[in-house]
Design a protein with these regions (language model features):
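DNA major-groove recognition helix of helix-turn-helix
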Residues: 18, 43, 53, 61, ...
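DNA major-groove recognition helix of helix-turn-helix/homeodomain DNA-binding modules
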Residues: 52-68
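Short polybasic/polar patches that bind polyanions
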Residues: 19, 30, 59
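Extended catalytic-interface subdomain
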Residues: 95-96
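A short, Lys/Arg-rich alpha-helix, primarily the initiator
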Residues: 1-23
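Short alpha-helical DNA-recognition segment
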Residues: 22-41
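Short amphipathic recognition helices of helix-turn-helix/homeodomain-type DNA-binding modules
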Residues: 65-90
Length: 96
């Protein structure tokens, strides 16, 4: 289990959706009223999808509800927490 897999999936999904609509990251950023670097960081899995971002994405792509975007982010955070927990367990076992 990789801690970036879900985040990368969300970013890849977002990129595929904007490309399917003939948009660029720059145009998406403009429509959302967000800086381009924020969109790029989300697409590359380095920035979280917040509730505000999810609502903005829903405004630009109304057929994809904000809840969907938030669920992707929640899944990523849970995956990351599980990986951290497993890493901590493995470290404590090695120390014994």
């Amino acid at each position: 289990m990789k801690d970036t897999s879900t985040s990368q999936l969300a970013g890849k999904f977002l990129l595929e959706e904007i490309q399917a609509r003939g948009l660029t990251q720059k145009e998406l950023a403009r429509r959302m009223g967000r800086p381009l670097n924020v969109i790029n960081e989300i697409i590359n899995g380095r920035k979280a999808i917040t509730a505000e971002t999810a609502l903005q994405l829903e405004e630009v792509m109304p057929e994809i509800p904000a809840r969907f975007w938030l669920n992707l982010e929640t899944d990523f955070q849970l995956t990351k927490a599980l990986v951290n927990k497993q890493t901590q367990k493995a470290s404590s076992v090695r120390e014994k």
